[in-house]
């Protein structure tokens, strides 16, 4: 269980969205307070969802029907599938085809007509405007959003549930996952006290570096994690 929790938590650290939000908090008028509020929101969401998930699913027959090894193998296969999708860009190609409509003019030529902005685009614009606010409410909501259950998160919860450990051990595993996953915000919170400018510069450089990585770089990292999870799962069967 612990190896699965740590591997999945480490894979969350460098999420571009999470790092971008941390950089955003560091550039507020009160960066320490914003970062602390961001962390509180993240801990609240992640811890609350974890406890509800473990209590609800732990009371069902499903809890005893799978092992940690099976969770590791399943997580590894999903990671490899995601890596394949990133490499082939299947989703991106589908989205590009959907954003343009093919129509013909009087001469029979095929023209490309842009589709009006979708609801998702409008929602993204509103979210961007919301994040520009300087209220602590924005920091708290950002933390809640950053900690919304992801595939890594649910994989860790499944491993914790399948372990059959005591409630205290499961709670400790949840806390460990959250602390490791939010390292990207915890370290800047501490380092800002000693070197605010260097902290801002380092986080901005990290964000720029991640943005410069190609889709295949991300696919390679995801595939490596998937292979590691498969190896752990097969060795524990």
UniProtKB/Swiss-Prot annotation:
It is a multi-pass membrane protein. Its main location: membrane. Keywords: Cell inner membrane, Cell membrane, Cell wall biogenesis/degradation, Lipid transport, Membrane, Transmembrane, Transmembrane helix, Transport. GO terms for cellular component: plasma membrane. This is Sulfolipid-1 exporter Sap. It is found in: Cell inner membrane. InterPro entries: Gap/Sap. The keyword Thylakoid does not apply. GO terms for biological process: cell wall organization; lipid transport. The chain crosses the membrane at residues 5-25, 38-58, 66-86, 141-161, 171-191, 217-237. Required for the transport across the inner membrane of sulfolipid-1 (SL-1), which is a major cell wall lipid of pathogenic mycobacteria. Could also transport SL1278 (2-palmitoyl-3-(C43)-phthioceranyl-alpha, alpha'-D-trehalose-2'-sulfate), which is the precursor of SL-1. May potentiate SL-1 levels and confer specificity for sulfolipids over structurally similar glycolipids. Disruption phenotype: Accumulates the precursor SL1278. Can produce SL-1, albeit at reduced levels. Belongs to the peptidoglycolipid addressing protein (GAP) (TC 2.A.116) family.
